[in-house]
Amino acid sequence: MDQTIVRSALFVPATRPERIAKALGSGADAVIVDLEDAVAENLKVQARANLDAFLDANPQARVLVRINAPHHEQQAADLDLCRRQPGVVAVVLPKAESAAQVELAAACAKPVWPIIESARGLLELPAIARAAGIERLTFGALDLGLDMGLSSTSVAAQRILDQARYAILLHSRL
Protein backbone atom coordinates (compact mmCIF):
# COMPACT_ATOMS: atom_id res chain seq x y z
CA MET A 1 0.00 0.00 0.00
CA ASP A 2 1.17 3.54 -0.75
CA GLN A 3 2.47 5.16 2.45
CA THR A 4 2.74 8.76 1.21
CA ILE A 5 0.54 11.19 3.08
CA VAL A 6 -2.31 12.89 1.24
CA ARG A 7 -2.82 16.02 3.31
CA SER A 8 -5.53 17.54 1.17
CA ALA A 9 -8.01 16.08 -1.29
CA LEU A 10 -10.59 18.18 -3.10
CA PHE A 11 -13.84 16.61 -4.27
CA VAL A 12 -15.33 18.12 -7.41
CA PRO A 13 -18.70 17.05 -8.81
CA ALA A 14 -18.43 15.87 -12.41
CA THR A 15 -21.53 17.94 -13.12
CA ARG A 16 -19.30 21.02 -12.75
CA PRO A 17 -16.38 20.35 -15.13
CA GLU A 18 -15.27 24.00 -15.00
CA ARG A 19 -14.30 23.39 -11.37
CA ILE A 20 -11.94 20.52 -12.20
CA ALA A 21 -9.26 22.79 -13.66
CA LYS A 22 -9.58 25.15 -10.69
CA ALA A 23 -9.16 22.25 -8.29
CA LEU A 24 -6.12 20.97 -10.17
CA GLY A 25 -4.53 24.40 -9.84
CA SER A 26 -5.26 24.64 -6.12
CA GLY A 27 -2.19 22.81 -4.87
CA ALA A 28 -4.25 20.03 -3.30
CA ASP A 29 -2.46 16.70 -3.03
CA ALA A 30 -5.35 14.98 -4.81
CA VAL A 31 -8.35 16.01 -6.88
CA ILE A 32 -11.22 13.54 -6.75
CA VAL A 33 -13.88 13.96 -9.42
CA ASP A 34 -17.14 12.68 -8.01
CA LEU A 35 -19.58 10.57 -10.00
CA GLU A 36 -21.36 9.32 -6.87
CA ASP A 37 -22.86 11.33 -3.98
CA ALA A 38 -22.41 14.80 -5.48
CA VAL A 39 -24.30 13.82 -8.65
CA ALA A 40 -28.09 13.44 -8.83
CA GLU A 41 -29.30 10.15 -10.31
CA ASN A 42 -30.74 11.82 -13.41
CA LEU A 43 -27.37 13.48 -14.14
CA LYS A 44 -25.05 10.45 -13.80
CA VAL A 45 -24.63 9.82 -17.54
CA GLN A 46 -24.06 13.52 -18.28
CA ALA A 47 -21.57 13.82 -15.42
CA ARG A 48 -19.53 10.91 -16.79
CA ALA A 49 -19.63 12.47 -20.28
CA ASN A 50 -18.44 15.79 -18.77
CA LEU A 51 -15.46 14.09 -17.14
CA ASP A 52 -14.63 12.16 -20.31
CA ALA A 53 -14.69 15.37 -22.37
CA PHE A 54 -12.60 17.25 -19.79
CA LEU A 55 -9.92 14.55 -19.79
CA ASP A 56 -9.91 14.39 -23.61
CA ALA A 57 -9.43 18.18 -23.77
CA ASN A 58 -6.82 18.21 -20.96
CA PRO A 59 -4.57 15.18 -21.51
CA GLN A 60 -2.08 16.44 -18.90
CA ALA A 61 -4.72 16.37 -16.13
CA ARG A 62 -4.39 13.71 -13.43
CA VAL A 63 -7.43 12.99 -11.25
CA LEU A 64 -8.92 10.33 -9.07
CA VAL A 65 -12.52 9.35 -9.73
CA ARG A 66 -15.07 8.39 -7.09
CA ILE A 67 -17.21 5.95 -8.99
CA ASN A 68 -20.70 4.82 -8.11
CA ALA A 69 -21.04 2.21 -5.38
CA PRO A 70 -21.00 -1.53 -5.99
CA HIS A 71 -24.32 -2.79 -7.37
CA HIS A 72 -25.20 0.67 -8.74
CA GLU A 73 -26.32 0.46 -12.37
CA GLN A 74 -23.76 3.10 -13.43
CA GLN A 75 -20.69 1.49 -11.85
CA ALA A 76 -19.67 -0.58 -14.89
CA ALA A 77 -19.75 2.49 -17.15
CA ASP A 78 -17.76 4.46 -14.54
CA LEU A 79 -15.10 1.73 -14.46
CA ASP A 80 -14.97 1.69 -18.26
CA LEU A 81 -14.24 5.43 -18.29
CA CYS A 82 -11.51 4.95 -15.66
CA ARG A 83 -9.95 2.14 -17.70
CA ARG A 84 -9.95 4.15 -20.95
CA GLN A 85 -8.74 7.49 -19.65
CA PRO A 86 -5.01 7.80 -18.88
CA GLY A 87 -5.73 10.93 -16.82
CA VAL A 88 -7.51 8.81 -14.22
CA VAL A 89 -4.76 7.81 -11.80
CA ALA A 90 -6.89 5.97 -9.22
CA VAL A 91 -10.42 4.81 -8.51
CA VAL A 92 -12.11 5.81 -5.25
CA LEU A 93 -14.54 3.00 -4.39
CA PRO A 94 -17.39 4.09 -2.09
CA LYS A 95 -19.20 1.73 0.25
CA ALA A 96 -16.53 -0.97 -0.11
CA GLU A 97 -17.72 -4.10 1.67
CA SER A 98 -15.68 -6.95 0.19
CA ALA A 99 -12.38 -7.85 -1.42
CA ALA A 100 -14.31 -8.96 -4.52
CA GLN A 101 -15.69 -5.43 -4.96
CA VAL A 102 -12.19 -3.99 -4.72
CA GLU A 103 -10.82 -6.51 -7.20
CA LEU A 104 -13.63 -5.74 -9.65
CA ALA A 105 -12.68 -2.05 -9.50
CA ALA A 106 -8.98 -2.91 -9.82
CA ALA A 107 -9.72 -4.79 -13.06
CA CYS A 108 -9.77 -1.38 -14.79
CA ALA A 109 -5.97 -1.39 -14.24
CA LYS A 110 -5.96 1.62 -11.89
CA PRO A 111 -5.10 1.65 -8.17
CA VAL A 112 -8.12 1.53 -5.86
CA TRP A 113 -8.87 3.62 -2.78
CA PRO A 114 -11.79 1.82 -1.07
CA ILE A 115 -13.86 3.90 1.35
CA ILE A 116 -14.80 2.03 4.51
CA GLU A 117 -18.16 3.54 5.44
CA SER A 118 -20.41 0.74 6.68
CA ALA A 119 -20.40 -1.83 9.46
CA ARG A 120 -20.05 -4.57 6.82
CA GLY A 121 -17.03 -2.81 5.31
CA LEU A 122 -15.45 -2.51 8.75
CA LEU A 123 -16.01 -6.22 9.46
CA GLU A 124 -14.50 -7.12 6.08
CA LEU A 125 -11.57 -4.74 6.54
CA PRO A 126 -8.87 -7.46 6.84
CA ALA A 127 -9.88 -8.98 3.48
CA ILE A 128 -10.38 -5.60 1.83
CA ALA A 129 -6.92 -4.45 2.94
CA ARG A 130 -5.32 -7.54 1.34
CA ALA A 131 -7.26 -7.29 -1.94
CA ALA A 132 -5.30 -6.94 -5.15
CA GLY A 133 -5.08 -3.39 -6.49
CA ILE A 134 -5.35 -1.42 -3.24
CA GLU A 135 -3.27 1.75 -3.12
CA ARG A 136 -4.63 3.11 0.17
CA LEU A 137 -7.61 2.79 2.49
CA THR A 138 -9.97 5.67 3.19
CA PHE A 139 -12.63 6.26 5.83
CA GLY A 140 -16.16 7.61 5.56
CA ALA A 141 -16.89 8.46 9.20
CA LEU A 142 -20.22 10.19 8.56
CA ASP A 143 -21.68 7.32 6.53
CA LEU A 144 -20.33 4.72 8.98
CA GLY A 145 -21.96 6.60 11.83
CA LEU A 146 -25.25 6.72 9.93
CA ASP A 147 -25.01 3.03 9.02
CA MET A 148 -24.46 2.16 12.68
CA GLY A 149 -27.17 4.50 13.97
CA LEU A 150 -24.70 6.62 15.94
CA SER A 151 -25.54 10.10 17.18
CA SER A 152 -23.06 12.60 15.77
CA THR A 153 -23.05 14.52 19.06
CA SER A 154 -22.43 11.50 21.31
CA VAL A 155 -19.05 11.08 22.99
CA ALA A 156 -19.55 7.31 22.83
CA ALA A 157 -20.19 7.51 19.07
CA GLN A 158 -16.96 9.46 18.62
CA ARG A 159 -15.08 6.75 20.51
CA ILE A 160 -16.55 4.07 18.26
CA LEU A 161 -15.57 6.06 15.17
CA ASP A 162 -12.08 6.57 16.61
CA GLN A 163 -11.75 2.79 17.01
CA ALA A 164 -12.81 2.31 13.40
CA ARG A 165 -10.33 4.98 12.27
CA TYR A 166 -7.58 3.23 14.26
CA ALA A 167 -8.44 -0.17 12.70
CA ILE A 168 -8.26 1.34 9.21
CA LEU A 169 -4.93 2.98 10.04
CA LEU A 170 -3.49 -0.32 11.28
CA HIS A 171 -4.69 -2.22 8.21
CA SER A 172 -3.24 0.45 5.93
CA ARG A 173 0.22 -0.33 7.29
CA LEU A 174 0.09 -4.05 6.46
Question: What does each model-identified segment do?
Answer:
Residues 2-174:
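Conserved alpha/beta-domain cores
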